Amino acid sequence: MLQHVGIELQAADVDRAVEFFTLLGFTRVEPPPALVDGFTWLERDGTQVHLMHDERPTVPPRAHLAVVTADLEATLSRLHEHGFEARPGREHWGAPRAHAIAPGGHRVELMAKPPPASA
């Protein structure tokens, strides 16, 4: 099980990133006291996204997070309503996919269901 992933972004993008991940079902949680400065944590179903505040963040051009969403069309609508870039993608393993850009430029794949374990 993946416990967390960390992504770098400028401090100015943190509030919008929290809004973005909240629309994907994450909630903000408090990091340990030693990590309060410079980090913002979000969690959904035991998996965390750690937003690491950085003056010069690194955004890998092809790397991405993949998030399963119960209602892909509703998720895309919510993202658009809040001004986030998101577009439908190709179907894989019998389920639709979409792609969004999180604040800070990180790519996020949205999946209607995960691929089978053997994929």
What are these regions (language model features)?
Residues 34-38, 59, 92-96:
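Short acidic/glycine-enriched loop/turn segments that link adjacent beta-strands
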Residues 8, 66-70, 101:
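Short hydrophobic/aromatic beta-strand micro-patches
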Residues 8-48:
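Core segments of cupin and vicinal oxygen chelate
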Residues 1-18, 63-65, 114-119:
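N-terminal beta-strand motif that seeds the catalytic metal site of vicinal oxygen chelate
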Residues 39, 48, 66, 97-99:
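Short hydrophobic/aromatic beta-strand element in the GNAT-like acyltransferase core
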Residues 82-119:
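Vicinal oxygen chelate
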Residues 62-84:
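Mid-chain, well-packed structural core segment of small domains
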Residues 19-23, 78, 104:
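Structural preference for long, well-ordered alpha-helical segments within the folded cores
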